[in-house]
């Protein structure tokens, strides 16, 4: 079925719909499978919230929070400002969402189809804002709380955003963006204009003539007036998710109300198979579609509960699992490796208890087989690998339970099809041959007014930019992102394959392999390695003889101490002698360090030669104390590639 907008749109503001790609550039959508035949008219906010309340009741827990700063919520009885309830029932959530939808369509003047920017840390309040935008028939543009003013300005310009709901603590950059005509509603500060305060909601209801004076204050949340969701078409635009823009102008990925339900009815329903008593948690923010699906859409669709909070670090993640009885966890491979290390260090209260976990999803980057095996050996749990894309909204290749094979992403999620194609994006390749991954299913890429649509969608298929191999048993094995392939002297080297081999070495904690321009070979492979703490390598130094950016810190410190009159040694030494001695000591220390780094690099070379073909072995090693990552732990290889292009030894001629 090739679905294009046909039903009458509920949008008054038709900008998003008007700026979809031409229909002949759309991917072919598959909507004939089990559970994917949706009615022409549906509102995903009503389906996720109102229909769930009807099925499971209003008293079930929907969201939990814990560890966030107190959310001011004035008590009309005594004026105190207590912390928010730690558990939001489905009834409380619906009352909050309906009240906020009334604020949006009342005092803020939002009409169906308007784009509403959402900004703030992961919290029940931010999720309530998203649901309110859905029920109001508007279009959610959820951004990261860490994005800066220039990024926000660009997103608002591309999506023509004129309304925003923003956590008060995240408002600074949005104000600095100076978006013309932007109407911002703040929440979380408890002031008279807090859009989530009960009295703000009450006043809007009174203006609408829905209640007598004081009636809302006297009614419990479950009995407050309902906001009837806008009667949107299934193919009305629900959200625009912007890519990170690391390669230039960010791309706005447009998804419909139907798409939101489709990802829940495929990956979640068929792979995760959630239960109403599940507790979901994870590290991805709601500004990423990985987080939106895993922490809002999937649990609500199943009538389950989600922990919506912000935290970082392996110990904190384990405490969250232990304290809240988390059963479904979403995070990146790096986080699972860090948790494995933390599990060996008991908490202050004793050994870690993560026995509540039953589903662990890994996505965002390649899951090394070594990480899978280590997690399974330590916990008995089989990590669920998956690949998704902002263009596809969520995961489309995966496997669960006995179908899982370490080192293999898996099969197309039921409802999707996948194949491997040549660089032209069209010609199918046989099993066992590396090529570009092409996929189609109930959702697909539709960029907002962007000529790059023709690059991503070829012949009705979404060509993701990932290099994969389809094996004879039908499983798909990740090779590399297309831009992670290193071409050296005519050989193709997949950086992730070399990284996975490096991670099998006991002295390697993290690794990333990228290309460096080279006149003779085109590129050479360079391994950036974070050694284990007990390795005889010092952070931030290059093993090819070049000191890293911090390699001279000790000498600088010595010079500072000399200037302060604290140089050690013979008090009869003159100042010049002391300086010379300190610098000689620093040179000797650097020489010793470089020797140890060279030994470690040689050890890793020998190890890799036993694991991989010789041409795949990196020709240079750079040792560092950390690799660049996003807030969710995803490796930023593009930063390493930029550093290699600027490296003194880089020779592109």
Where are these regions (language model features)?
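Conserved beta-loop-beta connector loops within the AMP-binding
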Residues: 419-438, 471-473, 595-601, 636
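AMP-binding/adenylate-forming catalytic core of the ANL superfamily
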Residues: 147-150, 164-166, 329, 441, ...
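Conserved pre-ATP/AMP-binding loop-to-beta segment of ANL
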Residues: 59-61, 201, 206-211, 222-242, ...
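Conserved structural elements of the adenylate-forming
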Residues: 94-102, 234-239, 253-275, 283, ...
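Conserved AMP-binding/adenylate-forming
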Residues: 83-88, 101-147, 285, 492, ...
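Conserved AMP-binding/adenylation subdomain of ANL enzymes
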Residues: 261-279, 286-328, 342-348
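Conserved ATP/PPi-binding loop(s) of AMP-dependent carboxylate-activating enzymes
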Residues: 411-415, 426-459, 475, 491-493, ...
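Gly/Ser/Thr-rich phosphate-binding loop
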Residues: 326-331, 342-405, 417
